Amino acid sequence: DREILRMASDASGINEALFGQADERLKRSPLFGILKKNPYKGGVIPPENSDFVSDDNLFNYQAKVIKELAEQESCVIIGRCADYVLRDDPDVIKLYFCAPKRDCVARVMNQNGLSEKEAEKRIEKIDKYRAEYYRYYTGRDWNDARNYNFCLDTTSMSYEKLVEVVTNFIQIYQK
């Protein structure tokens, strides 16, 4: 997942830490949401421009890397609005995984040693950032099933079972 940030940093010459700071988060301003929506147009801003290290340009460099990766080989890209960036590629399979909040909270508690309240806050914060980021760059709702080829509730699945189900779906979908 972080590999895309490193590759975008290499391609742009922008410090990888800046990509990390903007990773699926938007900087807030009072006019956020009013002035801009869906600024992704596929290009990148040159270094001499004052917006070279803007969030939008950081996103555009990541999008450029995502497109290059998809052109070179089969790959799995998690998040980063890749479904939207690659929307015109007929070979892209867009997957969405979800689970009830109580299951997500339990998982975050176990993985991070957090209390229930801390886990809930973390999930709410991250989901809010991701939803805003996705809406800003795509103009779409992150949780809208129409944006994906396959949506799956992973509640009662082990990782092994999830891999099996997804692999089977991909084989059927590609026929």
Please give the residue ranges for each predicted region:
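A short beta-strand-loop structural module common to alpha/beta enzyme folds
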Residues: 1-5
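Conserved phosphate-donor/acceptor-positioning beta-strand/loop module used by diverse small-molecule
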Residues: 88-110, 116-124
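Small-molecule kinase domains that catalyze NTP-dependent phosphoryl transfer to phosphate-bearing small molecules
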Residues: 24-37, 115-159
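RNA pseudouridine synthases
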Residues: 69-72, 81-88
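Short, amphipathic alpha-helical "lid/cap" segments that border enzyme active or binding sites
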Residues: 63, 159-167
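ATP-dependent small-molecule kinase phosphotransfer cores
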Residues: 7-74
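Short, charged, intrinsically disordered terminal tails
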Residues: 168-175
